[in-house]
């Protein structure tokens, strides 16, 4: 069984912030992922914050996690440049992002 981190950005909308983590958990269960951590932070136009990237890399080193499950690339960054930059930094540590 592969081990994964769930990552999502909180929108401030109660229904959405409740529904998204449940959807991501179900996706992990249906696809054979063991959830090691569920991480979230307020939505930002920059995407994943530097402290969150640091936390994900730390979990990768301590928990042997190499997959991040998220709802869409928009949760990684608001622009293609932000997304590519984040994916590049994470891939240096053999961490890959899978969106549903």
Language-model-detected regions and their locations in the chain:
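Short, structured surface patches at the beginning of a domain
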Residues: 1-100
